[in-house]
């Protein structure tokens, strides 16, 4: 039997025994709020840092997630009833707010921070101070696979972001956006009850 088969068998057994929820009790003590019925599947890397984490009720985060506050006072809020797919990354040096009932496909990246990029500085880009701006995602959105949401972006409620999009600008309520950089391609018309091209 190969090492990979043994590893997968052990991982599957461990997942069943722990219900994929390893470490949740430890994390709960660090949270500003950890909602009823909320679940974080193992393995996960969660770093409260010097900030706060608030996870709403009945939210499920699949395995491979990385959620981190990098600065004192950083604030991460994830609402009620969210489903977050495998390999989710949320990197915060400001504030990230995710509304209620938001659906994330796998390997989504949300970041409110970036390294300074002053080429005249004596410091390398890695050593330059972080530049940050809040990110907000409205209620009921659907964020596609491998989407990147960059600092300063607000996505309105009930929006859909197409797979592999890079969101650099705000997306209004009830819109579909896609591409790199993402642009609005459709908006819902409540009079015709249809998604219409923009």
Predicted ranges, named:
Residues 1-111, 138-139, 157, 173, ...:
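Domain-scale signature associated with acetyltransferase and cell-envelope carbohydrate enzymes
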Residues 124-135:
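A short acidic, glycine-rich active-site loop
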Residues 109-111, 115-116, 130:
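Extended, non-globular alpha-helical segments
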Residues 117-121:
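Short acidic/His/Gly/Ser-rich catalytic and metal-binding motifs that mark active-site loops
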Residues 91-93, 97, 145-160, 165-168:
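Beta-rich strand-turn-strand
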